[in-house]
């Protein structure tokens, strides 16, 4: 199992994995742009996509945003893959890192807190902003 930056050769595998799971919030255009800009990370095992996560610098707010986390197969839920992705990818940032889960996503909020992220505020009634400094 490895976590690394995605490359162009990963594009089709990633898109198929998110389409097979029925994910609508991550589009092929997101994947293509994130790969081309070096901000798409992928967890692979035996040439299969296990999880993806993007690390995008937000110049307006001055932090690295972790976006579009997806464990691509439901059978892999609860195995710690999301936590591994968050830990490895947040370590790639050279500054403040942020993540914005929904307030009712208790598993994600708990995982972020375990990794040392702090809840800074809640916005638009349902979004939490968690951050961590290097």
For the regions a language model picked out, list residue spans one by one.
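A short beta-loop-alpha structural element at the N-terminal edge
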Residues: 1-14
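Helix-loop element at the rim of GNAT/NAT acetyltransferase active sites that forms part
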Residues: 16-29
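Conserved beta-strand in the GNAT
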Residues: 42, 48-57, 63-70
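A short, internal acetyl-CoA/4′-phosphopantetheine-binding micro-motif in the GNAT/acyltransferase core
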Residues: 67-77, 101-102
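Conserved acetyl-CoA-binding loop-helix of GNAT-fold acetyltransferases
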Residues: 77-91, 110, 114
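Conserved GNAT acetyl-CoA-binding A-motif
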Residues: 92-103
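Conserved catalytic-core motifs of GNAT/GCN5-like acyltransferases
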Residues: 100, 118-132
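Conserved active-site alpha-helix within GNAT-family acetyltransferase domains
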Residues: 103-122
């Amino acid at each position: 199992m490895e976590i690394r930056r995605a490359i162009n050769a990963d594009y089709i595998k990633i898109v198929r994995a998110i389409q097979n799971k029925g994910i609508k919030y991550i589009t092929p255009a997101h994947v293509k742009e994130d790969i081309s800009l070096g901000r798409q990370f992928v967890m692979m095992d035996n040439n299969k996509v296990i999880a993806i996560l993007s690390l995008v610098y937000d110049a307006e707010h001055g932090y690295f945003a972790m976006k579009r986390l997806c464990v691509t197969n439901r059978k892999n839920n609860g195995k710690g893959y999301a936590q591994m992705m968050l830990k490895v990818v947040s370590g790639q940032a050279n500054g403040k890192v942020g993540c914005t889960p929904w307030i009712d996503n208790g598993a994600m909020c708990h995982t972020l807190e375990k990794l040392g992220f702090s809840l800074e505020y809640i916005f638009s009634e349902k979004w939490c902003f968690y951050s961590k400094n290097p």
